[in-house]
Amino acid sequence: MTAVRAARVVVVGAGVVGLLTALECALAGHRVTVLDRGTIPDPGSSSYDQHRAIRTLVPGDPEGTRRMVAAHRRWRELETVLGTAFYRRVGVVTAWPPDRVAAVVASAAEAGVEVTRLDPAGLPHLGFPAGATGVRETRAGVLLARRVLRAAARWLAAHPAVVLRPHCAVTAVDPRSGRVELAGGEVLSADLVLVAAGPWGRELVGRPVVLHRQTMLYLRPPDRLARWWRTAPAAGGLGADGRAWAVPPGGGTLLKISSDAVCREVAAADCADEDQAPWAERLALAGVLPDVGRYTVVAARACHYTTDAETGGAQLARLGPAVWARAACGGTGFASAPLVAGRIVDAVTEVAA
Ligand SMILES: Cc1cc2nc3c(=O)[nH]c(=O)nc-3n(C[C@H](O)[C@H](O)[C@H](O)COP(=O)(O)OP(=O)(O)OC[C@H]3O[C@@H](n4cnc5c(N)ncnc54)[C@H](O)[C@@H]3O)c2cc1C
């Protein structure tokens, strides 16, 4: 058996991908430096939200489903590693047109993912498209995202092989040499570099991506519905056009709704000057919550993600012998973070062998 030495790893970006990768590398015996231009965690990162949904079924994609089952398993274990409860396994319901349901259920059965059909009348406070059928995935639910980030940052700060460097903006990463340049002129080198700078990564990684901005609305349910929402699942395929989703409140969070209909392509991941009110209004009228007028609107916020310009997906790419990047961060970018972390640990282990 080949002995593995402790390698030096530099992670650029302390969102969920950077933090989990640092954690897994430290657990594997490597030395890790995490750089972020903001605090760690950074409230401006795209991971820093109340919650993110996790599900395992990728209809029609058994390999993708197998990977998400592995990610789900790792999230459960991470609750123990980090000593923090952050997963609300409330299930995820997706609304499907009747002619698609049989294929989705068959796809789940083939992949060994447990689902049940559901009459939308059983979830009267969620707005389903006319005629839709619900499919409920039980091995799914809500990750309390901020809680994950804070727990991971605490764990890393206490680990002797990890150095956290907040307020360190990276200005360039050379894919061939692996040199990492910081604002101020400092240069770092490592056996492996991961660029996990979220929507801002495109400034460091020269790969074509499409930048998207999406507005989310945070609401407090009326008192009389608080009990109902306590056990409600996350849900997708909602609203009159079937493009909206809802993440239920719980664990100290608010109800959140959004829709692909308010997702737009933008040129820059900075929306400080953009008025969110018109987008919030569209969301409120999307039919996600049948009695939306009874809910208290607490906030509207925009968040960014990127998709690969060719495939439309998120992507982990090897840019050079020792440089990797989460080149695009869209879709299931939070839930799938353990998969990126696992792949990087494998790559570091190869380098260190
Ligand atoms: C509206 C919306 C809803 C979503 N819902 C879900 C969901 O339900 N489930 C799911 O799985 N995913 C979801 N996602 C996707 C998910 O949130 C992201 O894919 C994921 O959080 C990205 O994490 P990250 O670590 O790659 O990037 P980020 O969390 O954005 O972290 C990047 C970090 O890099 C730092 N940084 C940037 N540039 C530099 C630099 N030059 N130098 C140093 N540091 C730098 C930033 O400060 C930041 O802290 C959603 C995304 C959006 C926008």
Set out the residue ranges of the language-model regions.
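Conserved beta-strand-loop-beta-strand element in the redox core of flavoprotein oxidoreductases
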Residues: 171-187
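Active-site substrate-recognition segment that forms the wall
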Residues: 23-27, 85-87, 199-321
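Glycine-rich FAD pyrophosphate-binding loop
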Residues: 27-47
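Glycine-rich phosphate/pyrophosphate-binding beta-alpha loops
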Residues: 323-337
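Short hydrophobic core segments
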Residues: 10-12, 35, 187-200, 341
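Flavin (FAD/FMN) cofactor-binding and adjacent substrate-gating region
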Residues: 95-166, 172-174, 307-309
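Dinucleotide-binding Rossmann-like beta1-alpha1 core, especially the glycine-rich loop
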Residues: 50-126, 131, 243-244
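N-terminal Rossmann-like FAD-binding beta1-loop-alpha1 element of flavoenzymes
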Residues: 8-34
